[in-house]
Curated annotation (Swiss-Prot):
Record's function text: Mitochondrial membrane ATP synthase (F(1)F(0) ATP synthase or Complex V) produces ATP from ADP in the presence of a proton gradient across the membrane which is generated by electron transport complexes of the respiratory chain. F-type ATPases consist of two structural domains, F(1) - containing the extramembraneous catalytic core and F(0) - containing the membrane proton channel, linked together by a central stalk and a peripheral stalk. During catalysis, ATP synthesis in the catalytic domain of F(1) is coupled via a rotary mechanism of the central stalk subunits to proton translocation.
Lineage of producing organism: Eukaryota, Viridiplantae, Streptophyta, Embryophyta, Tracheophyta
Assembly and binders: F-type ATPases have 2 components, CF(1) - the catalytic core - and CF(0) - the membrane proton channel. CF(1) has five subunits: alpha(3), beta(3), gamma(1), delta(1), epsilon(1). CF(0) has three main subunits: a, b and c.
A molecular function (GO) term: proton transmembrane transporter activity
Propeptide: 1-133
Chief site of localization: mitochondrion
Gene Ontology annotations for the cellular component aspect, listed alphabetically: mitochondrial inner membrane; proton-transporting ATP synthase complex
Keywords: ATP synthesis, CF(0), Hydrogen ion transport, Ion transport, Membrane, Mitochondrion, Mitochondrion inner membrane, Transmembrane, Transmembrane helix, Transport
HAMAP family per record: ATP_synth_a_bact (MF_01393)
Protein name (database record): ATP synthase subunit a-1
Organism of this sequence: Arabidopsis thaliana
């Protein structure tokens, strides 16, 4: 059913031009609407009168008047938005492929008479906002508490909020299983879970890091344990609907991987001094090949930190995007008023459930991979492998 606007006999013959005063009435609320197109947050009105939902048969598609009206609609949208690109998008969203002259004329008249507050313009915002919705919107960082300090801008975002929630949950969990927090000799379910994770990471450190006594290995254990639990809880928290996946952002995973890798490099220098650079040149390498191998090993060593962060970011972002896409597809089919669409949606729905289970496994696996690679890199720095 094609949407059209109410029109009368006078509006069909109207040749009035756009009122430039409408463009000057665009305020900050409209500007905020335009900036929200990509996130699907554009607001709009849905009038209750029947005119906008009426159907009108098309006229001659070769009529030059159709082309004139379509161009006029685009020009009016450009004038209202003061943005040629956005005006083109809104204009095409309104007239689409319609060849209905009264329909197009009513749109042009509404834009002329009512400007940005009119039914036509608000309908364009709705159409563009719905079309611009993206599976990547779930990764948008939204400022919750903006803060300005001089020329610097700081803000407490949704990413900061969920990182604090993760750390708070982690600290409370650790506190409640200690003696001061009420831990029992006979462990309860939470205490058993924490002890299981503790033993798992402890065994990982003992197996992967060689050349050190047990007491020295204990120096690195707290950092590795906290890193593993932080990543594990961040990944699992991202599976909760309407939450935020902290590890789906490259800057966060990159900052974590580089900070840890710099610490590992410092440990290597503390243990070996300048002899630490000897890992760049394996023993027995011919002298002519030495410069190339040193450069190659140096690039390989530096890219360890980059790959460590990219691996986590890419896996979490790709998995969540795929679940979002298939969920939207299944939901659209379920909302169709047709039994065949409903039955056809069962397939994507089962795939979404399977992918959700797979994402839970990926969330745990990526925390494990990140942790074991830290242990391997630390072992290489200590033993110069």
């Amino acid at each position: 059913m094609r949407r059209i606007f109410l029109f009368d006999e006078n509006s069909l013959n109207s040749s009035s031009t756009i009122d430039t005063s409408s463009a000057s009435t665009i305020d900050t609320s409209f500007a905020s609407q335009c900036t929200n197109f990509s996130s699907g947050q554009a607001s709009g009105t849905q009038d209750t009168h029947a005119g906008i939902f009426e159907d009108c048969p098309g006229l001659n598609p070769n009529d030059e008047r159709v082309v004139e009206l379509q161009c006029e609609i685009r020009e009016k949208c450009e004038a209202l938005t003061q943005d040629p690109e956005m005006g083109l998008i809104l204009g095409e969203a309104l007239h689409a492929e319609s060849d209905n002259v009264p329909f197009l004329q009513s749109i042009a008249d509404d834009l002329t008479q009512n400007g940005v507050s009119g039914e036509a313009f608000q309908e364009a915002l709705n159409i563009v906002g719905q079309a611009a919705a993206s599976p990547l919107d779930q990764f948008e960082i939204v400022p919750l508490i903006p803060m300005h300090i001089g020329n610097f801008y700081f803000s407490f975002t949704n990413s900061s909020l969920f990182m604090l929630l993760t750390l708070s949950f982690f600290l409370l969990l650790i506190h409640f299983v200690t003696k001061k927090g009420g831990g029992n000799l006979v462990p309860n379910a939470w205490q058993s879970l924490v002890e299981l994770l503790y033993d798992f990471v402890l065994n990982l450190v003992k197996e992967q890091i060689g050349g050190l006594s047990g007491n020295v290995k204990q120096m690195f254990f707290p950092c590795i344990l906290v890193t593993f639990l932080f990543l594990l809880f961040c990944n699992l928290q991202g599976m909760i609907p309407y939450s935020f996946t902290v590890t789906s952002h490259f800057l966060i995973t990159l900052a974590l991987s580089f900070s840890i890798f710099i610490g590992i490099t410092i440990v290597g220098f503390q243990r070996h001094g300048l002899h630490f650079f000897s890992f760049l040149l394996p023993a027995g390498v011919p002298l002519p090949l030495a410069p190339f191998l040193v450069l190659l090993e140096l690039i390989s060593y530096c890219f360890r930190a980059l790959s460590l962060g990219i691996r986590l970011f890419a896996n979490m972002m790709a998995g969540h995007s795929l679940v979002k896409i298939l969920s939207g597809f299944a939901w659209t089919m379920l909302c169709m008023n047709d039994i065949f669409y409903f039955i056809g949606a069962l397939g994507p729905l089962f795939i979404v459930l399977a992918l959700t289970g797979l994402e839970l496994g990926v969330a745990i696996l990526q925390a494990y991979v990140f942790t074991i690679l830290i242990c391997i890199y630390l072992n290489d720095a200590i033993n110069l492998h």
